[in-house]
Amino acid sequence: MLEGLGSPASPRAAASASVAGSSGPAACSPPSSSAPRSPESPAPRRGGVRASVPQKLAEMLSSQYGLIVFVAGLLLLLAWAVHAAGVSKSDLLCFLTALMLLQLLWMLWYVGRSSAHRRLFRLKDTHAGAGWLRGSITLFAVITVILGCLKIGYFIGFSECLSATEGVFPVTHSVHTLLQVYFLWGHAKDIIQSFKTLERFGVIHSVFTNLLLWANGVLNESKHQLNEHKERLITLGFGNITTVLDDHTPQCNCTPPTLCTAISHGIYYLYPFNIEYQILASTMLYVLWKNIGRKVDSHQHQKMQFKSDGVMVGAVLGLTVLAATIAVVVVYLIHIGRSKTKSESALIMFYLYAITLLMLMGAAGLAGIRIYRIDEKSLDESKNPARKLDSDLLVGTASGSWLISWGSILAILCAEGHPRYTWYNLPYSILAIVEKYIQNLFIFESIHREPEKLSEDIQTLRVVTVCNGNTMPLASSCPKSGGVARDVAPQGKDMPPAANGNVCMRESHDKEEEKQEESSWGGSPSPVRLPRFLQGNAKRKVLRNIAAFLFLCNISLWIPPAFGCRPEYDNGLEEIVFGFEPWIIVVNLAMPFSIFYRMHAAASLFEVYCKI
């Protein structure tokens, strides 16, 4: 018996091979382990291991190079922020300009080489660089270019006392932004298989260049917010806990004073969009770096489609929240710092609004998680760098908000005096922690669900179709050889004949497994039936309404901190407990991650909406 299985001349093995080669997914070939391995078969595996060693070294060396550049840039940013001796703003801008020019040279070389070999087949990661993602980065890039134009106008107005680097930097940044968006539109999905070592260094250099530009934008925006906070505290009579205003205004007169003042204020209103652009570009480039030399499977990602039908409830509620958020932010910015009474009323208004919104978001997230858990659909565990990065970013950036919230909770518990508005801060801080936890679970459940097409393919693979060539085949892929059917068919009574001589057999299951499978697929014996989750139109509409509502809510919660509505600065309790400078450092470090979390969560929820 063993010799018969291992013999290549066995008629049963030959028949199985012909069925496997012709029937495709409708037939199952015998396990490959039944055939003896050639003595030379382990050799390619050893060669593959040896070949992968240089690539692992290149990945490690390129990542270390990127970290060195990033750490050097952060130290330069820190030195300029604390006014270190011998470090000026011109030094910082020269360093960032040099990094951008080097990235521009690499992108031009890559685009030129890709254009010269455009007729060659290139592997693509269908999960990376989605259309809505590229559209978002294009919008942020346009605003970043407008920001660069304002900076050029600011330089022209103060050209008498500003160095030339402050004019060269915005020009270089604008050109860098335009070319980078073009590069990401055309090559974000690439899986690079040639010049891999060189490309690793080029891509990782681009990643950390964008991260340094992001850090530079965060630092400038934080300095501006801190100065406004100090001015409000001085107005309210808390000048004893403040330090000297960190003013970087040039020591000369602008040619049109009114225009220069408008430009300087407009610059800081555009910084949030520039910050989002830089971090979004760095994440897309990081996925490109992880995909270098990657071997992709044959499964293609199902293309997501945006459909607006059936989400009226979620969209209306979300747009209502968005309008209410804009109104709250406007009232908050008008009243805060005017007087002690107006500041307290503005804080109470914000806390009540945020508590209500966070409770609604938490309830919506719990409802979505409950629907997924009842559904009991299998998860997609395939390796996906883009999806893994999304999950890591959600957890990592949420930690910034959690740090601020835990600091507020400790300050409330440890403070000696408690103004009335602090008791609204306590439930707000607790809900901020819980809501992000629930929302992350909902997003993880959604993005790891198998798409509809994959589930059908899995069911199809469970059906083995064997056709008799004497009659019309059951499927176009069935072989037309009667001998094959006779050799493959088992000699027993377990396989009932089908009409027209076709024989369709399913995998053998015991009775318990059949009952479980029938109950999980709605009790229908049909092997090709959609999951219960996708059969229920009502459940799908509920999930899409939840995703749409959470998407608009996250956009709404991104607006207040991005445009200066930051109660962590203004309530004053944390500054009294922890000290002014320690608490300001904590807020300035954690706030950028908290702001980015909302935008990234909104992007993930948009993907969830399109996937449902």
Curated annotation (Swiss-Prot):
Q: Which UniProt keywords apply?
A: Biomineralization, Cell membrane, Cell projection, Hydrogen ion transport, Ion channel, Ion transport, Membrane, Transmembrane, Transmembrane helix, Transport
Which parts of this chain are annotated as the region Disordered? 1-50, 499-525
Q: Name one GO biological process term.
A: cellular response to insulin stimulus
Q: Which reaction does it catalyse?
A: H(+)(in) = H(+)(out)
Stretches assigned to the Extracellular side: 81-88, 154-163, 224-264, 335-344, 414-423, 564-581
Q: What GO terms are given for molecular function?
A: identical protein binding; proton channel activity
Q: Where are the transmembrane segments?
A: 59-80, 89-112, 131-153, 164-188, 197-223, 265-290, 312-334, 345-370, 389-413, 424-444, 545-563, 582-605
Q: May I have one GO cellular component term?
A: microvillus
Task: Indicate, by first and last residue, each region the UniProt record lists as having compositional bias (Basic and acidic residues).
Answer: 506-518
Q: Where in the cell is it found?
A: Cell membrane; Cell projection, Microvillus
Please indicate which superkingdom the organism of origin belongs to.
Answer: Eukaryota
The UniProt entry lists membrane topology as: Multi-pass membrane protein
- Output compositional bias ranges, type Low complexity: 1-46
Q: Does the keyword Cell membrane apply?
A: yes
Q: How is its activity regulated?
A: Activated by both acid and alkali, with proton influx in response to extracellular acid and proton efflux during alkali stimulation. Inhibited by Zn(2+); this inhibition is thought to be pH-sensitive. Currents evoked in response to mild acid (pH 6.0) stimulus may also be mildly potentiated by exposure to Zn(2+). Activated by NH(4)Cl.
What Pfam families has UniProt attached to this entry?
Otopetrin
User: Into which family does the record put it?
Assistant: Belongs to the otopetrin family.
Subunit relationships = Homodimer. Interacts with STAT1, independently of STAT1 phosphorylation status.
Notes on the domains: Residues involved in the gating by extracellular Zn (2+) and pH are located in the extracellular loops between transmembrane domain 5-6 and transmembrane domain 11-12.
Please explain the role this protein plays, according to its UniProt record: Proton-selective ion channel. Biphasically modulated by acid and alkali, mediating proton influx and efflux in response to extracellular acid and base stimulation, respectively. Sour taste receptor, which carries inward currents in response to extracellular acidification. Sensor for ammonium chloride (NH(4)Cl) in taste receptor cells. NH(4)Cl acts by increasing the intracellular pH, thereby generating a driving force for proton entry through OTOP1 channel. Might also participate in alkaline sensation.
- Its name, as the record gives it, is Proton channel OTOP1
High-level lineage: Eukaryota, Metazoa, Chordata, Craniata, Vertebrata
